[in-house]
Amino acid sequence: DLVRSRGLGDVYKRQGYTGPAITLSFAIAALGCCFAGLCYAEFASMIPVAGSAYTYSYATMGELIAWIIGWDLVLEYTVAATTVSISWSRYLVVFLEGLDIHLPQALTACPWDGGVVNIPAFLIVVLMSLFLIRGTEGSSIFNGFIVFLKVSVILIFVILGWKYINTDNYTPYIPANTGVLGEYGFSGILRGAAIVFFAFLGFDAVSTAAQETKNPKRNMPIGILVSLLVCTVLYMVFAHVMTGVAHYTAFSGQQGIAPVAIAIEHMGQADAAGIIQPDYPWLNRAIVLSILFGYCSVIMVTLLGQSRVFLSMSHDGLLPPFFSHINEKFRTPARSNLLFMVLVGLLAAFVPARLAGEMTSIGTLMAFTLVCAAVLVVRRTMPDVPRSFKTPLVPLIPILGILTCLCMMLFLPADTWIRLVLWMLIGLDIYVGYGMKHSKLEHGGDTRHGQVTLNMIGLILAVLCVITGLWHQQTVGWGESKVLLIISFVFAFTHCAYYMWRIWRR
């Protein structure tokens, strides 16, 4: 599931952040994933049950922190599935246009992108959800075929494109910063790393299906680390060839299949007029087709992660029993899958991709940061619990994982932080209103210590919402984010007052 078609072009499509140094962005992102992957591997061998980071934190850091991580994972999987579904729709339009079949824009884009409703995006979510409801056995066979197809196309592109690499295109390898944070230079590399981090989303989702894996204590760590290594090599080689066959400025501002298509168009010889005639025009269609299939697996694994996390949270009483109901025929959480099918389908049909896409990386990075922190906790609180794999060089590896992920998060836009904090505050409201009252723990979060921690976290989030709002207003202005800023300030001050009242009352 790590081998996906996104990430490789995202840095270019968003005005160009890195230039040829995109390979460094992948290296930094992979480094952060490696640290987090080692921590995930220890937990997967120690606690081989569904729920991913939520379950790990529930067993080591308590219910409140587990809720925060679980709610963050819901954001991560929801926006990831939404973003990829919208992108799938765009690539489908491009593929059909190559066959001289033209779909009306009104039915392939949301209202903010010049359409009415994105029907293909909605339909692919429905199809993948129904696939998952039938069980992961069929999904695994389908996913295996897709991975084989994607890896084959990547290798074909690399092999055919290697001889067209022009080393002059790597100069300058790190373009000078434009004066704007995150546009080229070192800050651009870090922002690029945070964006392409989405391409590595997968090994954490793999751990959500631990209950359905044969011999999870042995196979989960192996699957996580080996897949991470293989995909890092594939991504970096692919990016190296892309930036070698075409100058990085050729990718800026392109839409659709442009990142790969532009590179393929440069894989040829110039004619008498100086125009390059591509030697492999068929490769474009093959790339688009593999991306379409590749996106299917990405959508499927994110939808799988969503339902499994909610399944675990419902088992613990933090969410209604609806989410833990198992279908007798298929032995899957069908009701939960259907709910997320509707939610993600509607988001994919009516929300612009740019809004959902910006949230994916920051949610993932936050979850990874907390998992790395959980390893430090579990080594002190549960040192004697058997595990077939141990994170090496503790506390160095977890600390490096925390620092790497936080560093990438800091270079994401301020409005992305605002949306994250707003989402977490909403989650805290649900925990206070339902989770604490229905927790299956003897006391749940309703202890003096738990209440103090809850109130402090709520107050910190509210203050952080104010800070990020002011940061965005000062650096970018009101602009298109005026509504978001107003909502964030109202939400922040309301919650500041609420949690200060709770602290005073205690």
Model-derived features: positions:
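Extracellular loop-to-transmembrane helix junctions
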Residues: D10-C110, V230, V237, I486-F491
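Junctions where cytoplasmic loops transition into the N-terminal start of transmembrane alpha-helices
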Residues: A21, S25, F145-L149, A210-T243, ...
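Single conserved hydrophobic/aromatic residue that forms the stacking wall/gate
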Residues: D1-Y12
